[in-house]
Swiss-Prot record:
First and last residue of the signal peptide: none
Family statement drawn from the similarity comment of this UniProt entry: Belongs to the bacterial ribosomal protein bL12 family.
This protein's encoding gene: rplL
Name listed for the protein in its UniProt record: Large ribosomal subunit protein bL12
Classification via PANTHER family: 39S RIBOSOMAL PROTEIN L12 (PTHR45987), LARGE RIBOSOMAL SUBUNIT PROTEIN BL12M (PTHR45987:SF4)
Annotated GO MF terms: mRNA binding; structural constituent of ribosome
Matches recorded under SUPFAM superfamilies: ClpS-like, Ribosomal protein L7/12, oligomerisation (N-terminal) domain
InterPro entries: Ribosomal_bL12, Ribosomal_bL12_C, Ribosomal_bL12_C/ClpS-like, Ribosomal_bL12_oligo, Ribosomal_bL12_oligo_N_sf
Keywords linked to the UniProt accession: Ribonucleoprotein, Ribosomal protein
Pfam family, one: Ribosomal_L12_N
CDD domains from the UniProt entry: Ribosomal_L7_L12
Subunit record text: Homodimer. Part of the ribosomal stalk of the 50S ribosomal subunit. Forms a multimeric L10(L12)X complex, where L10 forms an elongated spine to which 2 to 4 L12 dimers bind in a sequential fashion. Binds GTP-bound translation factors.
GO biological process, one term: translation
Task of the protein: Forms part of the ribosomal stalk which helps the ribosome interact with GTP-bound translation factors. Is thus essential for accurate translation.
């Protein structure tokens, strides 16, 4: 039997259906007495007296508009600058507060956005 290259094998697998691949994996496991399941790492108990690690610092933040305040037009302008939304979309976002303005942004970007919105008269929350 001719030896197949890795590329040849992959080409053959691409032509198989999921059922055929599943049957192949089962046959392979039985033939070579192995399992296709990923090994699970088990952590041992923590050493006594070991300090508990601090929670990982959050690196993604959401800027949530909680209220438009008295200067709604200014807030809409700032929302448009921050999000590149159209006038109607920005107005709907401001009218529907509380709503997220920016999601999963860096801390400094979230702080700058919050400052801009607060400067326009909005009430803002950074989570």
């Amino acid at each position: 039997m001719a030896k197949l290259s890795q590329d040849d094998l992959l080409a053959q697998f691409e032509e198989m259906t999921l059922i055929e691949l599943s049957e192949f994996v089962k046959a392979f496991e039985e033939k070579f007495d192995v399992t296709a399941a990923a090994a699970v790492a088990v952590a041992g108990p923590a050493a006594p007296g070991a300090p508990v690690e601090a929670a990982a610092e959050q690196d993604e933040f959401d800027v949530i508009l909680t209220g438009a305040g008295d200067k709604k037009i200014q807030v809409i302008k700032v929302v448009r600058e921050l999000t590149s939304l159209g006038l109607k979309e920005a107005k709907d976002l401001v009218d529907g507060a509380p709503k997220p303005v920016l999601e999963k942004v860096a801390k400094d970007a979230a702080e700058k956005a919050a400052e801009s919105l607060k400067g326009a008269g909005a009430s803002v929350e950074v989570k």
